[in-house]
C-alpha cells in the first residue's frame, strides 16, 4: 500500500521520543489476512493557545502560570506527521468507506483508554475531502482547515529549465541566491550521513522554533537527527552551510519510493553576520529542487509556513489540508474547536489566482462545519465560539454567584468575602437602612407587583409621585417611568424617531442607544468619541435633516464625560435636538447629583434626559424627563413603556428613598470620587494603564480579551472582583477591567485590592508583560 514515505520514517520519531508522542498503529485486514488499510496514530499534548496570533508569548506564559491547563489538550491524531498524503493508506481507494469507520471506532476506544480529549484525523487533501466528510460527519466529527502546505509539480529536466518559466524579475532573486559562495564566502556540504552533527542541527533548529509565532512546533532533539541519519540512510540528504568553518544553517530533506520529495526541517544561526542578505532559505529551496529533479521526483512538498518565499519557487501552489476533529465526549467542544482552528490558524497571503480558490474552500468548510442547515435560524448559535471557547479553555467567569449584599465587599459562592470593585451602586445606597425599609414597606402596602401596563392598571400613586419628584429634581416639566434603563432608551428613541430622521451618536455610546436607533427605523451615523470637530462636520453634512444628537453623559466603559457644553452649542447652531443618557452621572456628578449636564451648566439645554435607578439610586428601572408634550408623547407611543408591566412598588419606593438620602448626604458623592481617584493613582503607580476622568469608573486597559477574562478570574480567586470588558463592549485594544467604586468603600478594602493588584503587576502591566 502506498504510504508516501513509508512507515519506517516514523522510527526516528519513536526512537527520539520527541514531544513525548505515544505511538499506535492501525491495521484493517480481510478475513483471509489480506490488508485493507493502515494508519499511524499518536497521542500528544498540544497547546492550542499557540495558534492564537493575538496572544503574545508573554501573555500566554502569564495565563499558563495562573491556569496551567489553559488550552492544553491531549490529541489522538491520525496522520504521517509530514502532511504528504492522506492519513489512511488503503489497498484500494474504493475501500475507504469500509475502513474509515473502523479506524474512527478504534480511535474512540484508544482515546478513552489513553485519556485523550480530542480525536483528529488530519491532512486530508481536497480530492478526498467529500468522501471523508460523508463518513465522518455522522460519527460526530467536524472539519476545519488545517495548516496549508506548499507543493510544486516537477515537469523540468533541470533547475535552469525551471527558472526559464519565470519572468526576469522573479528569476533573478532565485538565481542569485545560489551565489552564496562567491558573495559571502559560505560553503555547503551535501551529507547522507550526518549523525555526528546532530547536536549542532538541534541547536540551529531551535532558533527557528524560538522565532516561530504560528503554532506549537514539535520539539526536535539531537536524538531525532541522529535517528534520521541512521534509519533514513539513502533516503535523506542534509545540506550543511558553513561560514569560516562554523555551521550556520542546514536543510534536511527526505524521500520515499513514490514520486514525492519532502523538505523536512531546517535551522539557522540568526546571529550570522550575513543572515539577511544571504537568504540561505531561498538558496536551500533551489538546491532541494535541483536534487528532486535529479532523483526523477514529480512533486516537491515544501511544508507549511514561510509561504512568501516558497511561492517564489517555479510552479509552487498552496494546497489546503483539512482536519476532522471530535471531542471525546462533548459535541459543543467539537464545534468550538473546529471554529477556533478556522479562526486562529494563519492563512497564507496568496496571489489572486490562488486566493480565489482558497477562499472557496474556506467558505465550503465553514458551511460544512454547521450542525444546522442554512435555512435554520438557529445556525448562528452553532457558529459562535467566543464564550464556548472560554469554557473550553477553563477561563469562563461570567455569572459569578454572590450570596450577600454588595457593599465594600461581597460574599461570593465558594470564595468567601472578596473586595467589590465592580458595582454600579455608586452611592452605596442599596444597603442603606432607610432605602431597604422603604422598599419593604412598599411591598407590604402594595404587594410585590402591579401586574399591568402603566397605561392601564399598572400605575400607583407611588409611581406618579416618583415621576413628579424626578422632574423637579432635574428642573424638567415632566418625567415618565420605565421598567429598566435599557427599556427607557428603547421606548423614548423608538417613539421620537422614525424612518427619514437622522440620529447622530457618539461612537462609544451604550449598546441600548444603538439598539434603540435600530428599532426606530431612523438613519443613524457616528462621530468619533468626544470629537467635537467631527460632530460639527457631521452636523454640517446632514444639514436640512430632522436630527437628534444622542449621547451618554458618562461613558460606561471608559468613565469619560461627554463635552455636553460644546454639544449644546453645536445643537443650537444647527437646529438639532439633544438626548442625553445620564445613567452613570446621576447621583455622582453635579449639584445635588443632578448629573453631568448640571455639572457643566447645560441641563436646561438638554431636550431629553434619560436616567436609570440601577446605579446611584439603589433599585431597578429608568425614566425619561423633558418638556411635557415630549414626555406625554412617549407615554402613549413608547412601546417599552406601554407594553411592559410597570415598575414594582418596592423599586419605586427604594428610588424615592435613595433620592432623599443622596441629597441629604452630599458627602457620598465626594467619597465615591475620592475612592476612584485613589485607586486610579495607586494602580498607575504600579504600572497599570488605569484612567481617571473624574467619575466613579476607572478602566484598567490590558489590550487583549483573553487576558482580560483570565485576569478577571485570577483577581477574583485572589480576593478582588472586577468586571472584565472585551468586544463588543469595547474595541479589542481596550479590553481589560472596568473597576467602579461606591461611597461606602472602606480604606482597608481599597488597600487590600491594591495589594492584590501589586502582586499581579509583573504579569498584567505593559512593563511586566514585555519581560
UniProtKB/Swiss-Prot annotation:
E.C. code: 2.3.1.47
Entry cofactors: pyridoxal 5'-phosphate
Binding residues for substrate: 407, 510
Keywords: Acyltransferase, Pyridoxal phosphate, Transferase
Modified residues (N6-(pyridoxal phosphate)lysine): 615
Region (KAPA synthase) location: 419-771
Keyword check for Protease: no
One GO biological process term: biosynthetic process
Principal EC category: transferase
Region (Unknown) residue spans: 1-418
Listed transmembrane segments: none
Superkingdom of this protein's organism: Bacteria
Catalytic activity annotation: 6-carboxyhexanoyl-[ACP] + L-alanine + H(+) = (8S)-8-amino-7-oxononanoate + holo-[ACP] + CO2
Residues noted as binding pyridoxal 5'-phosphate in the record, renumbered to the chain: 485-486, 556, 581-584
GO molecular function: 8-amino-7-oxononanoate synthase activity; pyridoxal phosphate binding
PROSITE patterns: AA_TRANSFER_CLASS_2
Cellular component aspect of the GO annotation: peptidoglycan-based cell wall
Family to which this protein belongs: In the C-terminal section; belongs to the class-II pyridoxal-phosphate-dependent aminotransferase family. BioF subfamily.
PANTHER family on file: CLASS II AMINOTRANSFERASE/8-AMINO-7-OXONONANOATE SYNTHASE, LD36009P
Function: Catalyzes the decarboxylative condensation of pimeloyl-[acyl-carrier protein] and L-alanine to produce 8-amino-7-oxononanoate (AON), [acyl-carrier protein], and carbon dioxide.
Name recorded for this polypeptide: Putative 8-amino-7-oxononanoate synthase 2
Annotated organism of origin: Mycobacterium tuberculosis (strain ATCC 25618 / H37Rv)
Amino acid at each position: 500500500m502506498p504510504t508516501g514515505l513509508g512507515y519506517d520514517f516514523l522510527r526516528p520519531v519513536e526512537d527520539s521520543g520527541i514531544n513525548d508522542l505515544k505511538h499506535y498503529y492501525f491495521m484493517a485486514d480481510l478475513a483471509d489476512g489480506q490488508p485493507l488499510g493502515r494508519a499511524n496514530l499518536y497521542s500528544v499534548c498540544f497547546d492550542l493557545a499557540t495558534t492564537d496570533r493575538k496572544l503574545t508569548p508573554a501573555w500566554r506564559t502569564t495565563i499558563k502560570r495562573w491556569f496551567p491547563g489553559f488550552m492544553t489538550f491531549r490529541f489522538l491524531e491520525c496522520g504521517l506527521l509530514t502532511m504528504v498524503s492522506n492519513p489512511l493508506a488503503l489497498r484500494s481507494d474504493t475501500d475507504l468507506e469500509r475502513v474509515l469507520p473502523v479506524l474512527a471506532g478504534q480511535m474512540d476506544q484508544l482515546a478513552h483508554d489513553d485519556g485523550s480529549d480530542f480525536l483528529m484525523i488530519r491532512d486530508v487533501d481536497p480530492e478526498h475531502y467529500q468522501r471523508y466528510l460523508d463518513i465522518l460527519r455522522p460519527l460526530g466529527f467536524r472539519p476545519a482547515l488545517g495548516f496549508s502546505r506548499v507543493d510544486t509539480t516537477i515537469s523540468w529536466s533541470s533547475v535552469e529549465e525551471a527558472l526559464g518559466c519565470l519572468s526576469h524579475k522573479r528569476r533573478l532573486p532565485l538565481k542569485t541566491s545560489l551565489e552564496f559562495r562567491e558573495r559571502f564566502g559560505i560553503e555547503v556540504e551535501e551529507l547522507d550521513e550526518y549523525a555526528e552533527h546532530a547536536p549542532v542541527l538541534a541547536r540551529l533548529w531551535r532558533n527557528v522554533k524560538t522565532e516561530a509565532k504560528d503554532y506549537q512546533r514539535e520539539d526536535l532533539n539531537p536524538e531525532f537527527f541522529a535517528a534520521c541519519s541512521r534509519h533514513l540512510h539513502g533516503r535523506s540528504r542534509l545540506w550543511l552551510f558553513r561560514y569560516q568553518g562554523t555551521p550556520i544553517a542546514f536543510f534536511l530533506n527526505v524521500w520515499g519510493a513514490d514520486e514525492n520529495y519532502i523538505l523536512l526541517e531546517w535551522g539557522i544561526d540568526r546571529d550570522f553576520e550575513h543572515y539577511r542578505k544571504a537568504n540561505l532559505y531561498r538558496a536551500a529551496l533551489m538546491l532541494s529542487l535541483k536534487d528532486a529533479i535529479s532523483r526523477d521526483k514529480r512533486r516537491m512538498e515544501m511544508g507549511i509556513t514561510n509561504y512568501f518565499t516558497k511561492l517564489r519557487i517555479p510552479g509552487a501552489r498552496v494546497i489546503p489540508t483539512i482536519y476532522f476533529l471530535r471531542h471525546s465526549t462533548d459535541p459543543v467542544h467539537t464545534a468550538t474547536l473546529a471554529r477556533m482552528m478556522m479562526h486562529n490558524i494563519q492563512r497564507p497571503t496568496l496571489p489572486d489566482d490562488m486566493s480565489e480558490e482558497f477562499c472557496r474552500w474556506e467558505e465550503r468548510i465553514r458551511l460544512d462545519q454547521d450542525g444546522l442547515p442554512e435555512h435554520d435560524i438557529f445556525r448562528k448559535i452553532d457558529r459562535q465560539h467566543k464564550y464556548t471557547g472560554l469554557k473550553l479553555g477553563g477561563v469562563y467567569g461570567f455569572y459569578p454567584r454572590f450570596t450577600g449584599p454588595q457593599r465594600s465587599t461581597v460574599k461570593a459562592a465558594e470564595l468567601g468575602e472578596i473586595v467589590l470593585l465592580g458595582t454600579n451602586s455608586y452611592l452605596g445606597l442599596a444597603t442603606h437602612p432607610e432605602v431597604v425599609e422603604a422598599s419593604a414597606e412598599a411591598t407590604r402596602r402594595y404587594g410585590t407587583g402591579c401586574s399591568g401596563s402603566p397605561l392601564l392598571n399598572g400605575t400607583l400613586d407611588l409611581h406618579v409621585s416618583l415621576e413628579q419628584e424626578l422632574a423637579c429634581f432635574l428642573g424638567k416639566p415632566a418625567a415618565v417611568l420605565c421598567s429598566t434603563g435599557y427599556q427607557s432608551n428603547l421606548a423614548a428613541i423608538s417613539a421620537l424617531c422614525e424612518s427619514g430622521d437622522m440620529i447622530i451618536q457618539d461612537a462609544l455610546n451604550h449598546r441600548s442607544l444603538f439598539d434603540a436607533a435600530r428599532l426606530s427605523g431612523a438613519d443613524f451615523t457616528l462621530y468619533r468619541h468626544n470629537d467635537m470637530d467631527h460632530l460639527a462636520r457631521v452636523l454640517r453634512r446632514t444639514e436640512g435633516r430632522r436630527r437628534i444628537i444622542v449621547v451618554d453623559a458618562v461613558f460606561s466603559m471608559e468613565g469619560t464625560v461627554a463635552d455636553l457644553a460644546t454639544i449644546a452649542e453645536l445643537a443650537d447652531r444647527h437646529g438639532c435636538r439633544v438626548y442625553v443618557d445620564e445613567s452613570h452621572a446621576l447621583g455622582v456628578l453635579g449639584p445635588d447629583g443632578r448629573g453631568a449636564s448640571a455639572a457643566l451648566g447645560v441641563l436646561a439645554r438638554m431636550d431629553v434626559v434619560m436616567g436609570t435607578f440601577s446605579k446611584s439610586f439603589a433599585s431597578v428601572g429608568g425614566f425619561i424627563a423633558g418638556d411635557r408634550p415630549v414626555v406625554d408623547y412617549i407615554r402613549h407611543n413608547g412601546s417599552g413603556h406601554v407594553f411592559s408591566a410597570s415598575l414594582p412598588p418596592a423599586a419605586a419606593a427604594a428610588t424615592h428613598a435613595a433620592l432623599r438620602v443622596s441629597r441629604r448626604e452630599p458627602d457620598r458623592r465626594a467619597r465615591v470620587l475620592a475612592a476612584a481617584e485613589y485607586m486610579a493613582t495607586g494602580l498607575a503607580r504600579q504600572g497599570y494603564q488605569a484612567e481617571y476622568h473624574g467619575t466613579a469608573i476607572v478602566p484598567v486597559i490590558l489590550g487583549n480579551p483573553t487576558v482580560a477574562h483570565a485576569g478577571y478570574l485570577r483577581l477574583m480567586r485572589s480576593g478582588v472582583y472586577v468586571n472584565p470588558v472585551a468586544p463588543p463592549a469595547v474595541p479589542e485594544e481596550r479590553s481589560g477591567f472596568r473597576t467602579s467604586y461606591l461611597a461606602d468603600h472602606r480604606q482597608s478594602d481599597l488597600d487590600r485590592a491594591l495589594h492584590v493588584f501589586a502582586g499581579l503587576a509583573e504579569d498584567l502591566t505593559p512593563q511586566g508583560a514585555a519581560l
